[in-house]
Amino acid sequence: MRVFFIGFGQAGGKVVDMFIEQDKRMQTQSFRGIAVNTARTDLMGLKHIELKDRLLIGQTVVKGHGVGTDNVTGARVTADEIDSIINAIDSRGTHDVDAFVIIAGLGGGTGSGGSPVLARHLKRIYREPVYAIGILPAPEEGRLYSYNAARSLSTLVNEADNTFIFDNSAWKNEGESVKDAYNRLNDEIVRRFGVLFRAGEVGKAGVGEMVVDSSEVINTLRGGGISTVGYAISEKVNPRAKQSKGLLSGLMRKKEKTEEVLTGEDKSAKIIALVRRAMLGRLTLPCDYSTAERGLVLLAGPPDEMDRKGVEKSKSWVEENIAGVEVRG
């Protein structure tokens, strides 16, 4: 799946910066993106997004100093300069893009105010789906941030084709510094959504035996609303080399080591257990999964660990535990 990311505001720009870094490291060329902000210092702090892909807006209004957590001003500035933003996106190439993904912290001013405006215009111009990843502030960040998030989310859900939510308060660790906390949370976002948005892409090892392509992801997300993502991992230990290899259950994550190479029914049981842990574990947005309308199961790992029976049974288990009957994978 080829994705064009737009990082809106400080939080969104940092996350897109990490997606671009991950894409360069993996040499997959699945992602491209730009960062949009009203604060010059936030744009200068990015490391992997090229300078030409950093767009400063609202200079005549806020003179490069940001909107000061005022999302009304953020929305107005975005509307005034929407042509510049669309031109910046179009000049980077959109002919082979499968989806647009807007990433923003919903508690601030630029991202929370501008994201719904941009989503509306992207949907008007392009045929590809427009998704959003909204980062919710923790309650202790202050009432203003919570108010901004509530107002922005209600609008963003209506404008985007589907909205993923990452709830900071559900992922915080006590005693962690602010810098360490944000770095860890951003890393969790990139790890989880990186698996999802790379569905169907061909890696160095070639095409997998069982492939979930971009159309299955798009069809799962069709219909709008809010989505949450889980992620789980189980490590395989090679008895000869004694080196760990990851077995990822795509939408989901948590580490657990095993000292055996499993075969037959054991492989099937391992996959089912992995999907269960992913769905029952920590989701990006804690929720009652039994009310979900649709589901998608993504598995990635070495071919000798991919048991078709296990994959089918895990999909059946998800189908039995959600309200809807649409489960792809």
Give residue ranges: language-model regions.
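Tubulin/FtsZ superfamily GTPase core signature
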Residues: 1-329
